[in-house]
Structure formats: structure tokens, C-alpha cells
């Protein structure tokens, strides 16, 4: 049970941390710090020296992208963990986390490629809120009896 608490707790923490770093991206004007997607700049997946967008903006955006990989790993661990449980509710919520994170990657790319058009930006935030709600539900159900 402690392992389940740790796995779901880390997932919830990382989902929340991603919203915080996404807010930092938005508040610092770093949304196009990496002006291409999936690469950061043409020909490089990481920021490059003397990047036109500035190193600070590039690294803020790149850091947000990197955190997504830690989050995806955490969600995959949660899926693997709940596969052996008999709890369909946990399996569904964990699988939705993985699918939602992958969807966030695509939506993040659309957001960059549309030069931060308000609709994909809003969709990106809305999906983040849904993913946090799902992670919170996983965490709150960690000790709930199976029905």
C-alpha cells in the first residue's frame, strides 16, 4: 500500500509541478523559447548557444518539455503497477493519464506551431486541469475498497 501511495503521490506532484512550470513559461513570455516542435530549434532538440529567443526563455520552455518526460515515466509506472490489481477504476484512471500526457505533447506542439493562438493555449490548460483531477482521483482511491 505504501508503494501505491508513493507512485500515485509522485504522479500527482509531477502533474501539479508541470502546471507551475507551464505558468512560468507563460508569465515569462517563454512560450516560444523553443520556436519549433518537437525540436527546440531547427536541427536541435535542446536550446543552442546564441539562440535568437534568448537562453533564459529557451531553457524555461525546454525545462517544461523535459518535465513532461518525467511525468510520462511516472504515469507508465502507475499503469504497470495497477495492471496487476483487480481494480478497473485504477486501471482506467492510470491509462487515461498516459493518454492525456501524450495528448498534451501533441497539443503543446500545436500551441507552438500556431504561435500561441489562444484556443490551443486554453485547451492545453484545460487538459492539464483534467489530468490533475485524474491524478488526484487516483491518489484518493489508493486505499478505497474495490466495489
What is the meaning of each model-derived region?
Residues 4-8, 88-98:
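Membrane-interfacial loop-to-transmembrane alpha-helix junctions, especially the N-terminal start
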Residues 12-22, 71, 75-78, 101-108, ...:
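Helical transmembrane-bundle signal
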Residues 24-36, 49, 102-125:
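Interfacial helix-loop-helix junctions of multi-pass membrane proteins
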Residues 26-62:
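Extracytosolic (periplasmic/ER-lumenal) interhelical loops and adjacent juxtamembrane/interface segments
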Residues 56-77, 119-133:
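Membrane-interface loop-to-helix entry segments
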Residues 71-94:
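Transmembrane-helix motifs of polytopic, lipid-linked glycan transferases
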Residues 79-86, 137-145:
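Structural signal for the C-terminal ends of transmembrane alpha-helices
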